[in-house]
Amino acid sequence: MNRNSLLWLGAATLLATTGYAAAQTGAAAIGVTASVIKDVRLSNARSPKARPVVLRQRIALADLIQTGQGSQLQVLLLDRSSFSIGANATLRIDRFVYDPARGRNSGASVTRGAFRFMSGQANRANNTAISSPVATIGIRGTVLEGAVGEGAAKIAQGEVREVRQANADKRTATLVVLRGPGQRTEAGTDVGAASVTSGGVTVELTEPMMAAFVPREGAAPIGPFRISAAGLVLLEDQIFPVRVSGGGLLGGLLKALPAVLPGFGGSGNGKPQVFVPPVPVGRPSGAPGQF
């Protein structure tokens, strides 16, 4: 058994254990925290007071996760997909239905902050919907990044002229970027696709690095447009505000070739710890910026 298989076996065992504990309280575990850095808190209907999140803590449906200043989180879900969120972000998994033989159907809400979603298996049978305050984002077997709020507006304003004339709402504006897998990804993975719907209009993103921006509630998406290298770096900095000292994976790889991110993090006190799930898509062999 190779290292990746052992890592996933460990994650599955952890989820099975926490799933049993969750079942005792009526909450089914759908994932586990793979990275926790600095101030990350969780609340739900059973425990409305937000409490600190720790590494390898189970996540259940409807758990509301919030990050503080300079903080970040990665959640590994049962189907090997993952969510990463940056500082001052809010995430909730609203729906999760997974059958290994038929694929996944899941839904989540991001009401502020920057995020990355990575499909565990890069094929279009795995459908995910992410809701922001102004848009619905459909994801079909791929890797997607985005931001909600002032950070999204700042990035988009530097990308296309239409955004500067759109009177963006700095609380709810939403930027979405399709990241991959790219056409040159090995292992026969699907390129995947994403859609952004708002104001009765849907924009399709079918190529890596294509983006769309929704400036405010009721407005049609602006795009698709190709995000610049500078804009992509700004988005990456919002998703991953913390860099491991000495460079390494987070210091250089994120800006040069943002591939599927192994888990990293700490116990909530800022001290890095490591929990490394395997890369769920093929090794990139194309140009930087594609998976």
Where in the sequence are the language-model features?
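N-terminal post-signal-peptidase region of extra-cytosolic proteins
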Residues: A45-A62, Q66-Q72, L78
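Generic short beta-strand segments
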Residues: I37-V40, G70-L73, T142-L144
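His/acidic/aromatic-lined binding-pocket segments of jelly-roll/cupin-type domains
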Residues: G31-T33, I65-Q66, F83, G107-A108, ...
